[in-house]
Amino acid sequence: MTVINMTDLDLAGKRVFIRADLNVPVSDGKVTSDARITASIPTIRHALDAKARVMVTSHLGRPEEGVYSEENSLQPVADVLADKLGQPVRLIKDWVDGGFEVAEGEVVLLENCRFNKGEKKNAEETARKYAALCDVFVMDAFGTAHRAEASTYGVAQYAPVAAAGLLLVGELDALGKALCEPARPMVAIVGGSKVSTKLTVLESLAEKVDQLVVGGGIANTFLKAAGKPIGRSLSEDDLVPTAQCLMEKMAKRGAAVPIAVDVVCGKQFDANEPAVLKSAEDVADDDMIFDIGPESAKQLAEIILNAGTVVWNGPVGVFEFDQFGEGTKTIADAIAKTKAFTLAGGGDTIAAIQKYDIYDKVSYISTAGGAFLEFLEGKKLPAVEILEQRAKG
């Protein structure tokens, strides 16, 4: 995967347009989690240190195109950026047609790009206007790399130079290391409520990994496919044959989907619901499975500790409720201890990593959700493809 790395360019005095992923949660005009902003700082800092004239934009939320809305304004982000960079960050509202100056070593934040007409549809006119603002376009928003929009794809077509930022390069290197040249054994942990939303990921990983660990609602469908009772647990009956087929396919090449031997149940989905440990054979008709049991968790921890590569996307239980979080905690602890290259991504996964305090013990944490999944599926990401094309000249 060959792209131009921004660190290989002379940026002094150049107008550098950075598409970052600053789509952070905002409440009452304040950013409530600044992880994505923090992840974008090295790229912005590199451009500033190189004495570039720096412009940064991002989307935030899902505003109506062509309409300004205060609730989706990047002003709260500008405040956090200024604080983290230790210098003022002007927010520029109507920027598409230019008309503003940026000094060397200055950074401005260009208001939410989704306020602009033609952004989402990747309109050529909009993309060309973006490109006219800069000498160098830097794509650093891996989180939106799976979308071909004016600020992720179109501008890269028309800008004089199109390069990848530090965060994007880091994401691509980590994902490439985990998926293209994995140290064996390779283990993938895929959690989530529905098989249907992660079916292509499961099918793609089933061809690559040595152990495919399934968790959450997805695991219930696999439990059913393995002939185990699941009571009233969330599952997708129409996908039971698909789950059986995946397990058979993996078994044929000596790989496996480990099936839980014990589970933690409740009668209803509630923060105060008592947790009851049961053998996977003894789930009652009115039970709901909310976590894996300690024996299953121990087996999975052993698999993780002996792995060469671990890809983690999704918890294995309802970890938001502590009584149903022990399975995910055991997995997190094993990921923290293993000598394997560990790659984690997805909102729920990052929440679990933060809850169990293993952030600095994971080899690489992807900031992306959808793009991370599409990469796992083996799909080409449009925003990366255009950077590859531009690198060829």
From Swiss-Prot:
Record bears the keyword ATP-binding: yes
Protein name per its UniProtKB record: Phosphoglycerate kinase
Any Pfam family matching the protein: PGK
GO biological process: gluconeogenesis; glycolytic process
Recorded metabolic or biological pathway in which this protein acts: Carbohydrate degradation; glycolysis; pyruvate from D-glyceraldehyde 3-phosphate: step 2/5
Gene3D superfamilies in the cross-refs: Phosphoglycerate kinase, N-terminal domain
Homology family: Belongs to the phosphoglycerate kinase family.
Residue sites binding substrate per the record: 21-23, 36, 59-62, 114, 147
Residues that, per the record, bind ATP: 198, 320, 346-349
Catalysed reactions listed for this entry: (2R)-3-phosphoglycerate + ATP = (2R)-3-phospho-glyceroyl phosphate + ADP
Residue stretches spanning the membrane: none
Record EC number: 2.7.2.3
MF terms in GO: ADP binding; ATP binding; phosphoglycerate kinase activity
One GO term describing the cellular component: cytosol
Quaternary structure annotation from Swiss-Prot or TrEMBL: Monomer.
InterPro entries registered for this protein in UniProt: Phosphoglycerate_kinase (IPR001576), Phosphoglycerate_kinase_CS (IPR015911), Phosphoglycerate_kinase_N (IPR015824), Phosphoglycerate_kinase_sf (IPR036043)
Keywords of the record: ATP-binding, Cytoplasm, Glycolysis, Kinase, Nucleotide-binding, Transferase
Compartment list: Cytoplasm
Species annotation: Methylobacillus flagellatus (strain ATCC 51484 / DSM 6875 / VKM B-1610 / KT)
Major location category of this protein: cytoplasm
